Structures are given as structure tokens and as C-alpha cells.
């Protein structure tokens, strides 16, 4: 969206927020919003009216606000028209990201044991082996597309092994994940996505049948065991949780590894500093999470009770969408917010969210990124961007900030 268009737009649509053009100019747009329009009106098609939140303090407040609900059933009465879902989407929506307490607590408790600090540290050697194996394949060529050859396969292999899913199915997950996070309202895309979600549901049904027959020491088997021991987990919840773990278990990390590498490629002084001072890696990861937040916009929150924010009435059933990317560049919180600084102090970014829905896999994503980037820089010391910076394209995607590809030579 050009600056000329921005001045004439009074309401942003879902398709605009999902466009590549928006991604290209989003940071400048957010900067204007933070200065002059803290709440920006959205038209979200069948979902109704919404508001885009751009400031850090507002984001923190609203991410903890109990008047906002993730499950629309806690907002809409039985007589009111509900948000329309795709036919095959219903089976995949009953997960913790779409739930409120007490359901959220119940669902999160079932899986959080697998994501404790101790459990994540036990994966370190395995992740290191995966990183080395992936680089072994591409190093002789002295070239790779970092997205396809490294950033995507590493986390998908890790989460597949945690869940007990055959590795040969990982390319299917990529297609299905894109359908799940695609917020397009174009009729042909909706039809295609519904078809893909149908494929995914069939796959999950088959996978769960197999796990019931042959349980193993993996996370899906543990969820099935919980389901069989009582009313803790419905079948829809089981499918939805597996879907969420697959998608959230790799999408964020793909973008973190890719966006961090891209930021380092574009800021040679910071890359050189990191090479000279590898102990800055943890700080560099936090800055990458802030600078190019892997999740650009939050998933939907529904207003259960009306309230006033900055003089504007937020009505019941209004949708709230928070730009984590904008909050993480709020100059009131982050001095020189548009500068990539791997030694940034007091980096209170909210790239993994805040409150009840803080990302369960944050520790895993950080460890995967640390190993991936450290191994890449150690084994490929002459890494550089293949092509011009202007040739790199952000994907047109509502939720994520993701590059189409990242060609690098070494």
C-alpha cells in the first residue's frame, strides 16, 4: 500500500492486511498509527468490524484483558449469527489458542510437560545433529535457499519426532499449514483451503487410528492416553491440538531463523560483531524477534463486554487484532526502534505474546534458532546474500512475517 493509498483508506480490509504490498510498507504504516491513530478500523468480512492495535502499552493491556475472548462461543449468544467457518475448519478449531479459561488451562496442561526447560534441553544434541545434517547436504554446493534447505526442515523434523509423525509427511504439513494460516477471503482460495483442510483432517484421523493401535512414547500417544482416561479431551480437541502443535511447532521458528539471518545479512556490522562475540547470540535472537517479529499480527480476539479505549467505544462482538510487529517497534519502549542492535538492553519484546496465551514453545524456538544460526555462522563463515536486498519478497500472509525465499552463498 503506497503512502498515497494510506491517506485515502479509512478502513483496512482483511485482504489488504494479507497482501505483500502491506508487508513491504507495514513498518512505516505502523509508525504513523502509533503517533496518530492508536486504534485503526478494520473490515473483516464475515467476522465483522475490528480494530488494529499498534502501541506496546495497549498490546500488553489487551493481551491480558478478560473482556476479550479467544472462543467466540463465549461472546455470541445461541440466537446470534456465529462467524462462518469453512466446512473442514470446524474439526480443527478446538485448541488452546482458541480457548479461554478454564478450557485453556485444561488443554495447555495436557501438553506443557513436553515443553518444560528440562525437556527442551534434552533436545539440544538432536537439534545440533539435524542442523549439521542439513548443512552437510548443501555445503558442497556453496549455495542454498535458506528457507527450503534449512529454516523449514529443521523445526519440522524436531516437532515431527516429538509428536511421533513420519518424517516423509513433512512436505504435506507445509502445504496444510499455509492453508490454516491463510486468511484470504477470495472464493477460489477459500475453496482450495477447505479442500486442503479436508485432506489434513483425513490424515489426522488415520494417524490417530494408528497411534491407538500402536501407542509409543510420543506426544500424540500421550494425548490419546489422556483422551481415553476420561473426558479431558474430545476427539475434536485431540485433532485440533495435534494440528496446533504441528503448525505452531514449526511456522514461528522457520520465520525466526530466516528473518534473523536476513537481518544479519542486511546489517554487516552486527553480523561481524556476532562473529567476534558469539556470547551475544542470545541477545541477538531477542533482537531478531523484536526487529522482524515472526508473528506479525495476533489471531482474533472477540470483545465480550464493551469498553472504551483512547476515547473510542469497543463494542461487544468487535474483533481486536494486535500488531506484535508494531508494538515491538514502539519508540516509547525501544529507543531507536528501527535500528537492529544485537546488544539492545532491556529488550521487553512481545514476539511470543503475553499473558495466558504466551507461546508454549518459546524456549524450543529460541534453542532451535540458537543452534541453527550458530552452526550456520561457524560452518559457513563467508555467508552472504545472493542477489539484491530489494529482490527479497515478504509473503502475503495475514499472521506471519515470512520471506518467500532467502538465497545465500558461502
Curated annotation (Swiss-Prot):
This is Cytochrome P450. It comes from Bacillus subtilis (strain 168). CDD domains: CYP107-like. Belongs to the cytochrome P450 family. It comes from the Bacteria. Heme binds at residue 359. The keyword Translocase does not apply. It is an enzyme of class 1 (oxidoreductase). Pfam families: p450. Its EC number is 1.14.-.-. The lineage of its organism: Bacteria, Bacillati, Bacillota, Bacilli, Bacillales. The gene is cypA. The keyword Iron applies. Its cofactor is heme. Keywords: Heme, Iron, Metal-binding, Monooxygenase, Oxidoreductase. PROSITE patterns: CYTOCHROME_P450 (PS00086). Disulfide bonds: none annotated. GO terms for molecular function: heme binding; iron ion binding; monooxygenase activity; oxidoreductase activity, acting on paired donors, with incorporation or reduction of molecular oxygen.
